[in-house]
């Protein structure tokens, strides 16, 4: 579920001269997930896979994706000494609708580094993502498997 924390990292690093679109974000998410060891068919990538299946998906500049991935990685390391993989692999539940994305994470797994960076703040409406985004910590969220 932590993959969507990258939206706040991108929001902080984004420059008006380099606008994002859903296809770019989908490729960037797939790239970050792949580097973190997340399989392409993982449910966390549902949004990215749906975007890339849409008719009219534009060709992507892979160099631009790699450059942005590097910029995010450096910012995370410099700001909080945390890897993108540690962020992306955070467990939780994701609810995705046509207009909203809600990410619920276990309260007992809240990470002070992520909190300090503001990655878990609700960004609200992100026009370049096309949805309202909210993050929640909850004691009722249960996850299994390895935790970073």
Regions found by a protein language model. Give the residues of each.
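Short, compositionally biased pre-sequence/patch detector
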Residues: 1-148
């Amino acid at each position: 579920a932590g993959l969507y924390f990258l939206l706040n990292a991108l929001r902080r690093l984004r420059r008006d001269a380099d606008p994002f679109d859903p296809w770019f974000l989908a490729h960037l998410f797939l790239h970050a997930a792949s580097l973190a060891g997340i399989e392409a068919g993982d449910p966390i990538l549902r949004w990215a896979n749906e975007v890339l299946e849409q008719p009219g998906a534009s060709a992507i500049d892979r160099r631009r994706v790699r450059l942005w991935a590097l910029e995010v990685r450096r910012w995370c390391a410099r700001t909080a000494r945390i890897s993108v993989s540690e962020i992306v692999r955070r467990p939780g539940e994701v609810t995705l609708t046509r207009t909203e994305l809600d990410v619920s994470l276990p309260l007992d797994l809240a990470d002070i580094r992520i909190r300090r960076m503001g990655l878990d703040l609700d960004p609200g409406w992100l026009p370049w993502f096309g949805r309202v985004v909210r993050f929640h910590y909850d004691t009722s969220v249960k996850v299994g498997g390895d935790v970073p």
